């Protein structure tokens, strides 16, 4: 864009309501926001700079459970606990029977020093409880259910409204900071025992497996860590973690726990790119090196930013100290319009601390009794040792991910499943056409389940609008002290929080999933077949409403299928299974296996997508020897129930136009009998086109 075009842009904006929003920014940022995205190719190759800012210890629901148009507190299809209540009703062993998410009763909550909670391998696997997700209070304490809202963290919310938020982004491992950062920087935690692994905590003993920056270095892709050196990026300086929380890197440059970096000498790539930085104790600011590189046009192709402790958002530090820090990063990146037009900034969090999130993470089955997978689960199961229980390496709970770039403006939500290795996969997607940058440590299972983040972008026709972000100058720390923790008290009267009203534009997803159920007459068992005709792998979790075992995990790669069976010998021939999948996908199957053996009706339902139009068809059939009356209802909209009388051997197609619900569906087919036949299919028909968030999300 020429200088004259930039002036025209700003002149036109001044004549609209957007002018007030533009005035929130310094002149250099207003100029930068007038620059359109680099569109040299209209593809991911237009991204020339990838910047990753990984903050600390917040869960998705803790920050964004009330945000408009994401899968938060208003989720219409949350996981059901074994007691039949939703996962939001977390059991309490002492005191009230349960605890719901609550907003702490404190003024200016975004500036409060909210307490830190347990967040290690043992307590996180304890809360996860083999996928039942019902022991958060016992393992984390009551503050686990505390959340923030827009008035508390307005900068975070308006970043989400201005750019793109990912509401299915998980931390990589249900454990602490270092293991999750090892996933970001290396692709695993030494799961195969190489180089001193596996590492499940913050031992920082010195490791030897390969890291991704080394892969980039060997390939010729430029990279750098932006940080402050504190009192020294060496053992004497605790690798950047100092007693002064306003300098250093809080020890968050986890590359420095690898021997190849510890032993690197000045002048070597590993030293110069990972063990240098600002020195604010001697003068200057935390952002001088970043600002200089942006100004000079020398921002690397890939870079990571590590904040000092006070700005990391790690409890007990205030969330809004982090907001101030993030704005300074944005100011630096947008100070050179040409650089910003080619830059993608990913803002995420290493782990959830001890804060609750309601979406049960995908996990690999630990054994045949726990499920099946079409892709190898090698490297995804920890066998246990003297101090750590056995369990899957991941995924962990959801954490926030904001994708801030010229290609992600507009307030979108992307609901594909991601984790920290998705960052490595994005770098691969960008540079693999010219460089050998495949991350060697990322397991096949993780590559199947976790996407590469490209679905969050619109490279072909990016949004040319400007974001509206609040000023964060009031969030700069008023002192340089540490403060005692604020410990909130749960309210005596509880109620479920409601999300902000309204829909959110949603990116197209690569999913096309089917779960088919039928009674296996040869075994008398109930059989589920998981079929994936989409372009990405998917993880399913199956729970039972009438038995105490489970849940079971199933992973199905793109264009593959698998099946499993459940006996009803101990449940009076009754089966009651619910399948959970990505982006609100749910299937429920209830009935009696005796229907296939006697003279009764034996109904079944399958479904098919009309992808071109975003609609769905149910096929109702009766394989039994008696007639059956089935009623079909749709939870979206006000359509009257449809009633069908099926004779033995009859089939009926039931077509549903989903335009009014933006291709979302929640269809139930029932014979009306207590504990009788029920099929329920819910989710979104993906058409390859953008859509909206789930209209059934409960809002205020």
Swiss-Prot record:
Query: What would you give as a GO molecular function for this chain, any one?
Result: phosphatidylcholine phospholipase C activity
CDD domains hit by this protein: PLC
Q: How is it modified after translation?
A: Predicted to be exported by the Tat system. The position of the signal peptide cleavage has not been experimentally proven.
For this protein, the Enzyme Commission number is: 3.1.4.3
The reply on keyword Lyase is no
Disulfide bonds listed in the record: none
In terms of Pfam families, this protein maps to: Phosphoesterase, PLipase_C_C
Keyword NADP attached: no
Q: Which reaction equation describes what this protein catalyses? A: a 1,2-diacyl-sn-glycero-3-phosphocholine + H2O = phosphocholine + a 1,2-diacyl-sn-glycerol + H(+)
The protein's matches in InterPro entries, at most eight in alphabetical order, are given as: Alkaline_phosphatase_core_sf, PC-PLC, Phosphoesterase, PLipase_C_C, TAT_signal, TAT_signal_bac_arc
Instruction: List this protein's GO terms for biological process.
Output: lipid catabolic process
> What does the function comment of this entry state?
Hydrolyzes phosphatidylserine as well as phosphatidylcholine.
Q: Which family does it belong to?
A: Belongs to the bacterial phospholipase C family.
The name on file for this protein is Non-hemolytic phospholipase C
Q: Which organism is it from?
A: Burkholderia pseudomallei (strain K96243)
Its gene name is plcN
């Amino acid at each position: 864009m020429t200088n004259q075009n930039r002036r025209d842009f700003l002149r036109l904006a001044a004549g609209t309501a957007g002018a007030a929003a533009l005035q929130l920014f310094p002149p250099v940022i207003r100029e930068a926001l007038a620059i359109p995205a680099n569109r040299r190719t209209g593809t991911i190759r237009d991204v020339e700079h990838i910047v990753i800012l990984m903050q600390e210890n917040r869960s998705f629901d803790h920050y964004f459970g009330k945000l408009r148009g994401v899968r938060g507190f208003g989720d219409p299809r949350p996981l059901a606990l074994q007691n039949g209540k939703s996962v939001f009703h977390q059991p309490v062993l002492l005191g009230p029977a349960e605890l719901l998410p609550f907003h702490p009763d404190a003024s200016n909550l975004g500036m409060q020093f909210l307490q830190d909670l347990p967040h290690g391998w043992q307590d996180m696997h304890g809360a996860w409880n083999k996928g039942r997700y019902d022991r958060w209070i016992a393992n984390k304490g009551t503050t686990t259910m505390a959340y923030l809202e827009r008035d508390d963290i307005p900068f975070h919310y308006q970043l989400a409204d201005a750019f793109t938020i990912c509401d299915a982004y998980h931390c990589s491992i249900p454990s602490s900071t270092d293991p999750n950062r090892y996933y970001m920087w290396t692709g695993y935690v030494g799961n195969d025992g190489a180089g001193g692994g596996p590492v499940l905590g913050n031992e920082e003993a010195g490791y030897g497996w390969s890291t991704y920056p080394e892969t980039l270095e060997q390939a010729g892709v430029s990279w750098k860590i932006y940080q402050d050196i504190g009192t020294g990026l060496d053992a004497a300086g605790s690798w950047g973690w100092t007693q002064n929380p306003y300098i250093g890197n809080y020890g968050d440059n986890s590359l420095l726990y690898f021997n190849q970096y510890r032993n690197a000498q000045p002048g070597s790539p590993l030293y110069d790119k990972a063990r240098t930085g600002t020195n604010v104790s001697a003068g200057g600011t935390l952002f001088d090196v970043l600002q200089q590189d942006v100004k000079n046009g020398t921002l690397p192709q890939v870079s990571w930013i590590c904040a000092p402790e006070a700005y990391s958002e790690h409890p007990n530090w205030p969330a809004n100290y982090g907001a101030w820090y993030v704005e300074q990063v944005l100011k630096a990146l947008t100070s050179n319009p040409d650089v910003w037009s080619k830059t993608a900034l990913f803002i995420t969090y290493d782990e959830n601390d001890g804060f609750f999130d309601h979406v049960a993470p995908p996990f690999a089955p630990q054994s045949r009794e726990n499920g099946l997978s079409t892709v190898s689960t090698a490297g995804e199961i920890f066998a246990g040792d003297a101090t750590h229980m056995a369990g899957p390496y991941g995924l962990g709970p959801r954490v926030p991910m904001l994708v801030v770039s010229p290609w992600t403006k507009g307030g979108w939500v992307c609901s594909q499943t991601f984790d920290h290795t998705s960052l490595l996969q994005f770098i691969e997607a960008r540079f693999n056409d010219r460089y050998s940058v495949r991350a060697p440590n990322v397991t096949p299972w993780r590559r199947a389940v976790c996407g590469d983040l490209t679905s969050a972008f619109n490279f072909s026709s990016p949004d040319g609008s400007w974001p509206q972000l609040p000023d964060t100058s009031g969030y700069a720390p008023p002192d340089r002290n540490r403060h005692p923790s604020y410990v909130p008290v749960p309210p005596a009267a509880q109620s479920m929080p409601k999300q902000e009203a309204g829909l959110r534009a949603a990116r197209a997803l690569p999913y096309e999933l089917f779960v088919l159920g039928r009674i296996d007459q040869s075994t008398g068992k109930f059989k589920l077949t998981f079929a994936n005709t989409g372009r990405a792998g998917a993880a399913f979790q199956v729970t039972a409403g009438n038995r105490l075992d489970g849940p079971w995990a199933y992973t199905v790669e793109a264009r593959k299928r698998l099946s499993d069976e459940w006996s009803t010998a101990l449940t009076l021939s009754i089966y009651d299974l619910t399948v959970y999948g990505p982006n609100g996908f749910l299937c429920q199957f209830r009935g009696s296996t005796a229907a296939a053996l006697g003279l009764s009706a034996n109904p079944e339902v399958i479904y098919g997508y009309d992808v071109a139009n975003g609609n769905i068809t149910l096929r109702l059939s009766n394989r039994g020897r008696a007639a059956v009356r089935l009623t079909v209802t749709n939870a979206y909209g006000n359509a009257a129930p449809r009633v069908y009388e099926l004779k033995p051997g009859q089939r009926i197609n039931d077509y549903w136009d989903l335009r009014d619900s933006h291709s979302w569906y929640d269809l139930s087919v029932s014979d009306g009998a207590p504990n009788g036949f029920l099929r329920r299919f819910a989710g979104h028909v993906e058409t390859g086109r953008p859509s909206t968030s789930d209209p059934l999300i409960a809002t205020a």
